[in-house]
Amino acid sequence: MNFNINILGTGGTRPLHNRYLTSVLIEYHGESFLFDCGEATQMSLRKQKISWQKIKVICITHLHADHITGLLGIVMLMAQSGDTRKEPLTIIGPIGIKKYLDANIELLRVHKNYDIIYKEIIINKTEPILYEDKKKRIEYIKLKHSIECVGYLFIEKDKPGKFNTQKAESLNIPKGPIRKTLQEGHEVILNGKKILPSEILGESQKGLKFAYITDTAYFEELSTHIKNFNLVIIESTFKNDLKDEAKKKLHLTAKLAAKITKKANVYQTGLIHFSERYTLNKDLCELLDEAQQEYPNGEIFLTKDGMRLKANKDKFIIK
C-alpha cells in the first residue's frame, strides 16, 4: 500500500536544533500533500530526502508564524529547481493566505515558472470538501484558536473488492471498458440488463482515515468529526500541570488530546506540537504518560522529527 505519513517537525513557537516546527507530509501513490509549513520545513524535506516537486497541495491550518513562514521558501525552491514542475501548486488555508504569499512574492520579486491555485476557506461558508479525486478527498473542520484555524481530514475512499473473472464470464461481460467501469464501482447496462458491481466484486476494503489537528482549545464537538479514524495527529502543547495556561492560550494538553481521541474511538493517536519548554526526553515521556492514562485502551505515541509511518491494512506502522 503506497500511503506514507512523514513527520517533518513536532515543535511549536520556534524551531530548535533537534526539533523543527510542526509539519506533516503525506505521500500517496506518487503525490504528496503538505500540512503546515513553518520556518525550516524545507530543511526537513531535504533531511528526509523527500521530493518537494511532488507536492501537489499545501494545507495551512492558520496564519501564525510557526505554521506559515516556511511557505515562501518552498514556493521559491520549486521554481529554482529547474523547469521540471508542470502542474500548478494548490495552496489551501484560511482567508489571508493568498494576500500573505502574493505580497511576499511581489516584494521579493520571486520568479516562479508554475501557477498557484489558492483555495481560501471562509469558515462555516466554504463547503467541507476542499479537494477530491477518485481515490481520496481532503476536508476541513473548524477549530477553536485565537485566530481562524482549521484542522484537515485526509480520507481515502473505500476500494472495490476483488474482481471475480468467472462470475463476469458467466454473465457474458466482455473484457474492456465495461469490466473497468464495474471494477471502479459503477453499475453498467449490458444488453438491456442492469449489472451491479456487487454482482462481480468481492467485499470492498475500507479506506483509511487520517486527521491533522493543531492548534485548538478543547471543545466537545471536535470528537464527532474524527469518529473511528485510523490515525489522528493532534497537538499536545502542554502537560496537565499547565492546563490553565493551555485553556488561556487556546491549546491542548496531552490529557485533553487523548480525551478527544478516546471519545471518538480513534485507533491510533500521534501527539505533536510540543512546547519549547519540553526539551528533555523526561518531559516528553510525561506528556505521553498523561495521554495514555486518559486513554489506556488506545494506541498513543509521541511523534518525532523524521518519523515515517506506513499504511498497513487498517493501521499505520512506524518505519
Curated annotation (Swiss-Prot):
CDD domains linked to this entry: RNaseZ_ZiPD-like_MBL-fold
Question: What cofactor does this one take?
Answer: Zn(2+)
EC number(s) reported in the record: 3.1.26.11
Enzyme class comes to hydrolase
The terms under GO molecular function for this entry are: 3'-tRNA processing endoribonuclease activity; zinc ion binding
Kindly state which keywords UniProt assigns to this record, in alphabetical order.
Answer: Endonuclease, Hydrolase, Metal-binding, Nuclease, tRNA processing, Zinc
Residues binding Zn(2+) 1: 62, 64, 145, 215
Top-level taxon of origin: Bacteria
Per UniProt, the cofactor note for this protein states: Binds 2 Zn(2+) ions.
Q: Which Gene3D superfamilies match?
A: Ribonuclease Z/Hydroxyacylglutathione hydrolase-like
Q: Which family does it belong to?
A: Belongs to the RNase Z family.
Q: By its UniProt entry, which NCBIfam families does this protein fall under?
A: PRK00055.1-3, RNase_Z
Spell out the HAMAP family in the cross-references. RNase_Z_BN (MF_01818)
Identify this protein by name. Answer: Ribonuclease Z
Its gene is rnz
